[in-house]
Amino acid sequence: MHIQNAVKTASKRLHYLTVMARHGLPPEDLVSIYTTLIRPCLEYSSVLMVGCNKKQQAELERVQRRACKIITRRAGNISQPLPSLQSRREEAAVKLVRDMHDQEHPLHDLLPPTRGSRTGRTLRNQHRLADPEPKAKTNRLKNSTLHTAVRLYNEL
């Protein structure tokens, strides 16, 4: 439900981008309008959406593609292409797991121990979590935020 509301809100805000493009704003300004006005709607609580299904990912990416079409319609090409929303969500999830390694982090207890702390020895892969993929009996749990974030962190 949250993703549908985010897509709906961002789609409504695309109108502002269209109006600004019609008035001849340069593409750099249109990109900054997109990143300050529209993308926050799509990325609100994005760490929690890292495990969303393919259909929901496509809905979110569709809004960004529409914004890129509006921006590039006037200029032809953007000097720096916008990163996909999925890659930004994955980066945020990995950052969350890194932050959770801190003993003072409120969610620290949810992480499994690292391989180095479990064995007590210096290992090449000691930064990885001991369980490469947390055990999950259902796909819903397997695609949940924490499980997906741990899986992405271990893939680094």
Outline where the language-model segments fall.
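Hydrophobic/basic alpha-helical segments
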Residues: 1-156
